[in-house]
Regions:
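Carbohydrate-recognition beta-sandwich/jelly-roll modules
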Residues: 1-9, 15-288
Protein backbone atom coordinates (compact mmCIF):
# COMPACT_ATOMS: atom_id res chain seq x y z
CA UNK A 1 0.00 0.00 0.00
CA UNK A 2 1.11 3.53 -0.71
CA UNK A 3 2.61 5.61 2.08
CA UNK A 4 0.64 8.61 3.27
CA UNK A 5 2.14 12.08 3.31
CA UNK A 6 0.99 15.29 4.97
CA UNK A 7 2.09 18.84 5.59
CA UNK A 8 5.59 18.98 7.05
CA UNK A 9 6.28 20.80 10.31
CA UNK A 10 7.40 24.38 9.79
CA UNK A 11 8.76 25.66 13.10
CA UNK A 12 10.45 28.72 11.60
CA UNK A 13 7.98 31.08 13.28
CA UNK A 14 7.54 29.16 16.55
CA UNK A 15 9.32 30.08 19.78
CA UNK A 16 9.70 27.15 22.15
CA UNK A 17 10.41 27.04 25.86
CA UNK A 18 11.07 24.15 28.24
CA UNK A 19 9.41 23.19 31.51
CA UNK A 20 10.76 20.27 33.50
CA UNK A 21 10.83 18.28 36.70
CA UNK A 22 13.75 16.10 37.81
CA UNK A 23 12.55 13.30 35.51
CA UNK A 24 10.39 14.76 32.73
CA UNK A 25 11.06 17.55 30.26
CA UNK A 26 8.39 19.14 28.05
CA UNK A 27 9.08 21.44 25.10
CA UNK A 28 6.21 23.93 24.84
CA UNK A 29 5.01 26.54 22.34
CA UNK A 30 5.02 30.08 23.76
CA UNK A 31 2.13 31.15 21.50
CA UNK A 32 -0.34 28.39 22.46
CA UNK A 33 -0.63 25.83 25.31
CA UNK A 34 0.83 23.01 23.24
CA UNK A 35 3.50 20.46 24.12
CA UNK A 36 5.75 19.68 21.18
CA UNK A 37 7.71 16.84 22.78
CA UNK A 38 8.40 15.02 26.04
CA UNK A 39 11.71 13.54 27.17
CA UNK A 40 11.94 10.97 29.97
CA UNK A 41 15.26 9.28 30.74
CA UNK A 42 16.65 10.01 27.27
CA UNK A 43 13.57 8.70 25.41
CA UNK A 44 11.04 10.92 23.67
CA UNK A 45 7.32 10.98 22.93
CA UNK A 46 5.74 13.59 20.66
CA UNK A 47 2.93 15.83 21.85
CA UNK A 48 1.23 18.03 19.23
CA UNK A 49 3.94 18.45 16.59
CA UNK A 50 2.01 20.72 14.21
CA UNK A 51 1.46 24.32 15.22
CA UNK A 52 -2.01 25.33 16.42
CA UNK A 53 -3.62 28.74 16.67
CA UNK A 54 -7.33 28.07 17.12
CA UNK A 55 -9.70 26.69 19.71
CA UNK A 56 -13.45 26.08 19.54
CA UNK A 57 -15.60 28.12 21.90
CA UNK A 58 -19.35 27.42 21.77
CA UNK A 59 -18.48 25.51 18.58
CA UNK A 60 -17.11 28.66 16.93
CA UNK A 61 -13.48 28.75 15.80
CA UNK A 62 -11.57 31.43 17.65
CA UNK A 63 -7.98 32.55 17.22
CA UNK A 64 -7.16 33.80 20.72
CA UNK A 65 -4.73 36.57 21.48
CA UNK A 66 -2.21 34.86 23.76
CA UNK A 67 0.15 36.27 26.40
CA UNK A 68 2.80 33.83 27.63
CA UNK A 69 4.41 33.87 31.05
CA UNK A 70 6.92 31.40 32.44
CA UNK A 71 6.24 31.09 36.17
CA UNK A 72 9.20 28.87 37.13
CA UNK A 73 11.18 25.84 35.87
CA UNK A 74 8.13 23.57 35.99
CA UNK A 75 5.28 25.91 35.09
CA UNK A 76 4.09 28.19 32.29
CA UNK A 77 0.92 30.21 31.96
CA UNK A 78 -1.07 31.42 28.96
CA UNK A 79 -3.62 34.22 29.11
CA UNK A 80 -5.98 33.67 26.18
CA UNK A 81 -8.34 36.44 25.08
CA UNK A 82 -11.37 34.94 23.36
CA UNK A 83 -13.22 37.48 21.23
CA UNK A 84 -15.92 36.98 18.59
CA UNK A 85 -18.40 39.83 18.67
CA UNK A 86 -20.99 38.45 16.27
CA UNK A 87 -21.23 35.25 18.31
CA UNK A 88 -21.32 37.07 21.70
CA UNK A 89 -17.98 35.60 22.80
CA UNK A 90 -16.08 37.94 25.11
CA UNK A 91 -14.01 35.98 27.63
CA UNK A 92 -10.54 35.60 29.08
CA UNK A 93 -9.12 32.23 29.97
CA UNK A 94 -5.92 31.31 31.80
CA UNK A 95 -4.29 27.97 30.96
CA UNK A 96 -1.43 26.52 33.00
CA UNK A 97 1.00 23.86 31.84
CA UNK A 98 2.97 22.26 34.65
CA UNK A 99 5.36 19.33 34.89
CA UNK A 100 5.02 17.37 38.15
CA UNK A 101 7.29 14.31 38.50
CA UNK A 102 6.51 12.17 35.41
CA UNK A 103 3.28 14.03 34.64
CA UNK A 104 2.17 17.03 32.61
CA UNK A 105 -0.85 18.93 33.94
CA UNK A 106 -2.99 20.98 31.54
CA UNK A 107 -5.29 23.17 33.63
CA UNK A 108 -7.65 26.01 32.86
CA UNK A 109 -7.18 27.94 36.11
CA UNK A 110 -9.51 30.87 35.44
CA UNK A 111 -12.33 31.82 33.09
CA UNK A 112 -13.80 35.33 33.03
CA UNK A 113 -16.89 35.84 30.90
CA UNK A 114 -17.32 39.58 30.31
CA UNK A 115 -20.96 39.08 29.31
CA UNK A 116 -23.60 39.54 31.99
CA UNK A 117 -24.13 35.97 33.24
CA UNK A 118 -25.38 35.35 36.79
CA UNK A 119 -25.67 31.76 38.06
CA UNK A 120 -29.25 30.94 39.09
CA UNK A 121 -30.64 34.01 37.31
CA UNK A 122 -32.43 34.58 34.00
CA UNK A 123 -30.37 35.16 30.85
CA UNK A 124 -31.85 37.02 27.88
CA UNK A 125 -29.68 35.31 25.25
CA UNK A 126 -28.02 31.93 25.85
CA UNK A 127 -25.34 32.74 23.28
CA UNK A 128 -23.80 34.95 25.97
CA UNK A 129 -22.91 31.85 27.99
CA UNK A 130 -19.42 30.44 27.62
CA UNK A 131 -20.95 27.01 27.24
CA UNK A 132 -18.16 24.88 25.78
CA UNK A 133 -14.38 24.93 25.31
CA UNK A 134 -12.72 22.60 22.91
CA UNK A 135 -8.99 22.12 22.36
CA UNK A 136 -9.55 19.33 19.84
CA UNK A 137 -6.54 19.26 17.58
CA UNK A 138 -4.25 19.78 20.57
CA UNK A 139 -2.84 16.31 21.11
CA UNK A 140 -1.65 16.06 24.71
CA UNK A 141 0.64 13.13 23.86
CA UNK A 142 1.11 11.00 20.75
CA UNK A 143 3.23 8.38 18.99
CA UNK A 144 4.57 8.34 15.47
CA UNK A 145 4.85 5.55 12.90
CA UNK A 146 8.58 6.34 12.84
CA UNK A 147 8.91 5.03 16.41
CA UNK A 148 9.52 1.34 17.09
CA UNK A 149 6.50 -0.41 18.60
CA UNK A 150 4.20 2.61 18.22
CA UNK A 151 0.69 1.72 19.38
CA UNK A 152 -2.53 3.29 20.56
CA UNK A 153 -4.77 1.41 22.99
CA UNK A 154 -8.18 2.73 23.93
CA UNK A 155 -11.21 1.54 25.85
CA UNK A 156 -14.83 2.57 25.49
CA UNK A 157 -17.73 1.73 27.73
CA UNK A 158 -19.06 -1.71 26.74
CA UNK A 159 -22.23 -2.98 28.37
CA UNK A 160 -22.18 -6.10 26.21
CA UNK A 161 -20.18 -8.97 27.69
CA UNK A 162 -19.73 -10.44 24.19
CA UNK A 163 -18.26 -7.27 22.71
CA UNK A 164 -14.99 -5.82 23.94
CA UNK A 165 -14.84 -2.05 24.25
CA UNK A 166 -11.09 -2.16 23.60
CA UNK A 167 -9.16 -1.05 20.52
CA UNK A 168 -5.51 -2.01 19.99
CA UNK A 169 -4.12 -0.12 17.01
CA UNK A 170 -0.59 -0.25 15.59
CA UNK A 171 0.54 3.18 14.41
CA UNK A 172 1.96 2.57 10.95
CA UNK A 173 2.22 4.26 7.59
CA UNK A 174 -0.13 3.60 5.89
CA UNK A 175 -2.97 3.01 8.36
CA UNK A 176 -6.72 3.53 8.62
CA UNK A 177 -8.04 6.90 9.70
CA UNK A 178 -8.90 7.28 13.37
CA UNK A 179 -11.16 9.84 15.02
CA UNK A 180 -12.95 8.27 17.95
CA UNK A 181 -13.94 8.93 21.53
CA UNK A 182 -12.63 6.83 24.42
CA UNK A 183 -13.00 6.55 28.16
CA UNK A 184 -9.37 5.46 28.55
CA UNK A 185 -6.49 5.98 26.14
CA UNK A 186 -2.80 5.02 26.06
CA UNK A 187 0.03 5.43 23.57
CA UNK A 188 3.28 3.49 23.72
CA UNK A 189 6.54 2.80 21.94
CA UNK A 190 9.08 0.12 22.80
CA UNK A 191 10.59 2.62 25.29
CA UNK A 192 7.79 4.72 26.82
CA UNK A 193 4.07 4.51 27.55
CA UNK A 194 1.66 7.34 28.35
CA UNK A 195 -1.88 7.61 29.68
CA UNK A 196 -4.19 10.63 29.67
CA UNK A 197 -6.93 11.69 32.08
CA UNK A 198 -9.45 14.49 31.51
CA UNK A 199 -12.39 15.79 33.52
CA UNK A 200 -14.36 16.33 30.29
CA UNK A 201 -17.87 14.93 30.68
CA UNK A 202 -18.26 14.58 26.94
CA UNK A 203 -20.51 12.03 25.30
CA UNK A 204 -20.51 11.34 21.56
CA UNK A 205 -23.82 9.46 21.98
CA UNK A 206 -25.11 6.57 24.11
CA UNK A 207 -23.62 3.16 24.87
CA UNK A 208 -19.99 2.91 23.84
CA UNK A 209 -20.08 6.59 22.82
CA UNK A 210 -20.84 7.55 26.40
CA UNK A 211 -18.22 8.93 28.81
CA UNK A 212 -15.87 9.65 25.92
CA UNK A 213 -13.73 12.14 27.79
CA UNK A 214 -10.79 11.49 25.44
CA UNK A 215 -10.61 11.63 21.65
CA UNK A 216 -7.95 9.84 19.60
CA UNK A 217 -6.95 11.26 16.24
CA UNK A 218 -4.67 10.21 13.46
CA UNK A 219 -2.72 13.01 11.78
CA UNK A 220 -0.26 12.61 8.90
CA UNK A 221 2.76 14.89 9.30
CA UNK A 222 5.42 14.75 6.61
CA UNK A 223 6.07 11.05 5.99
CA UNK A 224 4.80 9.81 9.35
CA UNK A 225 1.41 9.07 10.88
CA UNK A 226 0.77 10.30 14.41
CA UNK A 227 -1.96 9.09 16.72
CA UNK A 228 -2.55 11.53 19.54
CA UNK A 229 -4.80 11.60 22.58
CA UNK A 230 -6.81 14.79 23.05
CA UNK A 231 -9.24 15.87 25.71
CA UNK A 232 -12.80 15.88 24.41
CA UNK A 233 -14.87 19.04 24.70
CA UNK A 234 -15.36 20.66 28.11
CA UNK A 235 -18.64 22.22 29.28
CA UNK A 236 -18.68 25.41 31.34
CA UNK A 237 -21.77 27.63 31.62
CA UNK A 238 -25.19 26.14 30.87
CA UNK A 239 -28.80 27.28 31.13
CA UNK A 240 -32.15 25.50 31.21
CA UNK A 241 -35.27 27.34 30.00
CA UNK A 242 -33.46 30.67 30.24
CA UNK A 243 -32.17 30.14 33.80
CA UNK A 244 -28.39 29.90 34.24
CA UNK A 245 -27.19 26.77 36.05
CA UNK A 246 -25.92 27.32 39.63
CA UNK A 247 -22.24 28.05 40.27
CA UNK A 248 -21.55 24.60 41.78
CA UNK A 249 -22.16 22.91 38.41
CA UNK A 250 -19.04 24.52 36.95
CA UNK A 251 -15.75 22.61 37.00
CA UNK A 252 -12.62 24.17 35.50
CA UNK A 253 -11.22 22.09 32.61
CA UNK A 254 -8.31 19.87 33.55
CA UNK A 255 -6.27 17.12 31.89
CA UNK A 256 -3.19 15.16 32.89
CA UNK A 257 -0.61 13.11 31.01
CA UNK A 258 1.56 10.51 32.74
CA UNK A 259 4.65 9.03 31.07
CA UNK A 260 6.49 5.92 32.19
CA UNK A 261 9.05 3.31 31.23
CA UNK A 262 8.45 -0.38 32.00
CA UNK A 263 6.27 -0.13 35.14
CA UNK A 264 5.38 -3.80 35.69
CA UNK A 265 8.91 -5.22 35.26
CA UNK A 266 7.96 -7.57 32.42
CA UNK A 267 10.90 -6.32 30.33
CA UNK A 268 8.67 -4.70 27.72
CA UNK A 269 6.75 -1.45 27.39
CA UNK A 270 3.08 -1.49 26.40
CA UNK A 271 -0.32 -0.10 27.37
CA UNK A 272 -0.24 -2.03 30.65
CA UNK A 273 2.61 0.18 31.84
CA UNK A 274 0.58 3.24 30.86
CA UNK A 275 -2.42 1.83 32.73
CA UNK A 276 -0.39 1.23 35.91
CA UNK A 277 0.99 4.78 35.75
CA UNK A 278 -2.51 6.11 35.00
CA UNK A 279 -3.56 5.20 38.56
CA UNK A 280 -1.49 8.17 39.74
CA UNK A 281 -3.57 10.66 37.69
CA UNK A 282 -7.04 9.12 37.67
CA UNK A 283 -9.85 10.73 39.58
CA UNK A 284 -10.80 8.26 42.30
CA UNK A 285 -14.44 8.23 43.39
CA UNK A 286 -14.90 9.60 46.88
CA UNK A 287 -14.40 6.99 49.56
CA UNK A 288 -11.97 4.83 47.53
Amino acid sequence: AEKETGAVVDDSKVTYDTIQSKVLKAVIDQAFPRVKEYTLNGHTLPGQVQQLKKILVNNHEITPEVTYKKINDTTAEYLMKLRDEKNFINSDMTVRLQVVDNQLHFDVTKIVNHNQVTPGQKIDDERKLLSSINFLGNSLVSVSSDQAGAKFDGATMSNNTHISGDDHIAVTNPMKDLAKGYMYGFVSTDKLAAGVWSNSQNSYGGGSYDWTRLTAYKETVGNANYVGIHSSEWQWEKAYKGIVFPEYTKELPSAKVVITEDANADKKVDWQDGAIAYRSIMNNPQGW
